Structure formats: structure tokens, C-alpha cells
Amino acid sequence: MKELIEFMARAIVDYPDEVEVTEENTEDQIVFHLKVAESDMGKVIGKQGRIANAMRTLLKVAAIRKGTKASLEIG
């Protein structure tokens, strides 16, 4: 799932080398933290958060297929 987030983020940013995804396991879910260049933050979030919501939806689908829960924090 980490690779999925990296792939999606690198496809839309201007500085793909600065994309960083970290993973934090909690008791009931996996929390992914996505960091991008300051100038790419708007592209990752999108108008009214549409890109961010789409990325979160795809992540949740992948997590359900693996039998777990996952969330994405962008910042």
C-alpha cells in the first residue's frame, strides 16, 4: 500500500524525488504519512480536496482487500 501512495503522488507532483511516505502501525489500522515539496502540496490536495479524497479512497479499497484499515495524512 505504501508503494501505491508513492506511485500516485509521484505521478502528479513536479518534484517526485521529494515524495516521502512513512508508515505507522496502530492497534486497529495503518496510518500513512505523505510528505511532498511545499510547492506540490496544492497538487496533491487538489481543488476542494478532490485529489486527496481520491487517494484516500483508493488506499481504503486496497486496505479492505488486505483485510485491514488504513488512513492517509498529508502534510
Annotated model-derived regions:
Residues 1-43, 54-75:
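RNA-contacting regions in translation and RNA-metabolism proteins
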